[in-house]
Amino acid sequence: ENAEIQCIPTFIAPKTTHIKGKSLVLDLGGTNYRVAIVDFDKATPTVHPNNGWKKDMSIMKSVGYTREELFKELADMIIGIKREEEMPIGYCFSYPAESVPGGDAKLLRWTKGVDIKEMVGEFIGKPLLDYLNERNKIKFTGIKVVNDTIASLFAGLTDNSYDAYIGLIVGTGTNMATFIPADKIEKLDQSCNAHGLIPVNLESGNFHPPFLTAVDDTVDAISGNPGKQRFEKAVSGMYL
């Protein structure tokens, strides 16, 4: 749990065939928030509108920012979307979170300058789902939460010509994910009944490289979380 590289399993099996239906997709990153509806009724997924809706979420980094304020910001864009049917939500959440069977996740800590303390240790998906369903006449049927690296990892599976995959993010922050055989992950709870390849969020931004310089030490010292995310602070957009 306190390891430098946490290797957080995700209990959502990827699918590359027989996918059908529509889903609302949310992407909350270190800087931007994006919303779109994805239609899987054809061989190639269709995004409506073409590039989705986008909003700058730098306000999340404000001192004293609350969960209620965050949920309202997220909901305001969703309420404006015209839907004629119920659908599930896929939530790409770009912060360290512990995935649980069923598709939700618990926030472990904030990174990238965000610090909404009341959300740490709490579920990410279900409270947002309840909040949205209280404010939408046409309900959402469920929610699945994945890290942005896991989403990138799954996207790579659309090209099946490779024998190994890595989901890499280098943006406001940095992180990566990959597939690891379930029998090699000793910390997996036996009740999960996991088998085959498991998508794992490495949380590699917390790696502490041995080659950092005095400049890196200065950046770390004046950051909001000294001693943590040292690799991220050395290479990602927020700190560069």
Where are these regions (language model features)?
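Charged, flexible boundary elements
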Residues: E1-T17, I143-N147, A151
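Charge-rich, low-complexity intrinsically disordered linkers/tails
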Residues: E1-I12, V47-H48, K54-K55, L107-R109
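Glycine-rich phosphate-binding loop and adjoining helix at the ATP-binding site
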Residues: G52-K72, A97-D159, A164-I166, K184-N206, ...
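Gly/Thr-rich phosphate-binding beta-strand-loop-beta motif of the actin/hexokinase/Hsp70
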Residues: F11-H48, G80, S99, Y165-A182
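Active-site core segments that coordinate phosphate-bearing ligands/cofactors
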Residues: F11-K15, L153, T158-V170, T174-L240
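Phosphate/pyrophosphate-binding loops at sites that engage ATP/ADP/AMP, CoA/4′-phosphopantetheine
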Residues: L74-P88, L132-K137
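Short glycine-rich phosphate-binding loop at a beta-alpha junction
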Residues: S23-L24, E85-S94, I143-K144
